[in-house]
Every structure is written in C-alpha cells, then in structure tokens.
C-alpha cells in the first residue's frame, strides 16, 4: 500500500465497518512492516509519521491490535501479537533481555511468538511467563502443508506442528497456568528483571509480586523458597 493511499484506506475501513457489531480491528502490516515510498515522496521516517497520524482515526470506537509492534503504532493499539522474546542475533556474545516488555507491560498487552513454531515449546512457554506475555499459538483446522496442500501423512512434522488437535489439550493447560500467574498483573508495571543465578530468573512488578523462572534441570532454593526444575513460581 502506497503511503499516499493510507488516509483513503482508513476512510474506507471506517465506512465499511460503520454498522458492524465488532469493537476491534487488527492492523497487522503496519505493525511489522515499515518501508519507504519514494515514488510518492515518502522516506521511512515520513512513512512512520503518516501511519502514526492516521491510526487514531480507527481508535475512536474500536480497539486495535497489531503484529510485532513497530513503535509508530504502539501508542494507538491495545494489544501486540508476536512481540519478540529473543535477541535478533544468536551466539554466545548475545543475551536476550525483556527490554520491550519492561517498557510496555502495564501499558499495552502482548503475546509471544507462536509456541508451536518453537523448537522447544516448554522453554518458550516459561519465557512467556518470565516476560509477562500471553502464550500464543497458530494452528490449522485441517491437516495441511504450510503451502495449504492437504497432507496425507498425519504424523509428519508439518502436520504435528500446526494441526490444532495435536496442541489444544496442552495449550489449554498452559493458558490456565499463565492466566493464574499473570492475569491480575496485566495493569502492573514491570520494575525489575534479573538472572539471580545461572538459568534462574526473577521478574518483579510494582504490586510487589515476583515470578521466578527456573530453566535448569534441578530444583533451586532461593531464600527458603523452592522453585521446581523446568518450572516457575509466583510469590506475592
């Protein structure tokens, strides 16, 4: 979409949804993509300013959700899906820290990258809890390839990864655990995050709540409190 058409597109959306019953929209692309439009005289900064100026028109009567979370859209949305939880670079020289989460928690809701796309769904779930993120999944209703073609082998890696029946039971259990730990912290500000010992992290909130996450294979005792191996524990 060329930048000069953004305002026209928003006017069209407002007209088409004027009598609709839903109260929210998802604006995916503007959250994950930001590009120049030199043909129409917009560099990336000017594109960001255009998006930031026009999005408030959509928030008058509706809530907005976006994907990934370009900063030019964050002030206008109430939820961000697929907020990154890992460093964009890999290697021993790089360590992931929840900088975005420390800034955003209590201001806007957010979810993780899809857990079923992770090489280690359990570890990714623990990171959700550590970072105050809602767990997220992306599924298909039918057994399909990523390209949409029906998969005859229902035990294939592709099918197992996205077919909803393979995940719904474990996902339901994880949602319940995350909800119990994080639900009443949605409006709380995250005040501190630290690695208190190798593989054990603590996230603190302005309510006084602390969440310990233990990624190691052994139970860990912290000031008389035992954090189970490969698990988390909330202390109020």
Identify the function of each model-found stretch:
Residues 1-236:
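Active-site-proximal substrate-binding groove within the catalytic cores of carbohydrate-active enzymes
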């Amino acid at each position: 979409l060329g930048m000069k058409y953004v305002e026209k597109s928003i006017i069209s959306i407002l007209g088409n949804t004027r009598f609709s019953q839903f109260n929210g929209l998802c604006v995916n692309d503007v959250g994950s993509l930001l590009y120049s439009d030199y043909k129409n005289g917009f560099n990336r900064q000017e594109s960001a300013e255009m998006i930031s100026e026009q999005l408030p028109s959509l928030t008058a009567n509706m809530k907005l959700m976006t994907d990934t979370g370009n900063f030019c859209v964050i002030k206008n949305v109430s939820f961000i899906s697929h907020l990154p939880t890992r460093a964009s670079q890999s290697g021993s020289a790089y360590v992931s820290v929840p900088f975005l989460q420390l800034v955003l928690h209590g201001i806007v809701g957010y979810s993780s990258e899809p857990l079923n796309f992770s090489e280690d769904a359990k570890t990714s779930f623990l990171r959700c809890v550590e970072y105050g993120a809602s767990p997220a999944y992306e599924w298909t209703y039918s057994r399909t390839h990523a390209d949409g073609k029906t998969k005859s082998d229902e035990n294939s890696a592709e099918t197992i990864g996205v077919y909803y029946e393979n995940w719904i039971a474990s996902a339901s259990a994880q949602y319940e655990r995350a909800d119990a730990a994080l639900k009443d912290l949605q409006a709380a500000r995250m005040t501190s995050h630290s690695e208190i010992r190798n593989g054990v992290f603590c996230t603190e909130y302005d309510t006084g709540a602390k969440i310990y996450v233990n990624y190691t294979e052994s139970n860990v005792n912290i000031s008389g409190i035992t954090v189970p191996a490969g698990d988390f524990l909330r202390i109020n």
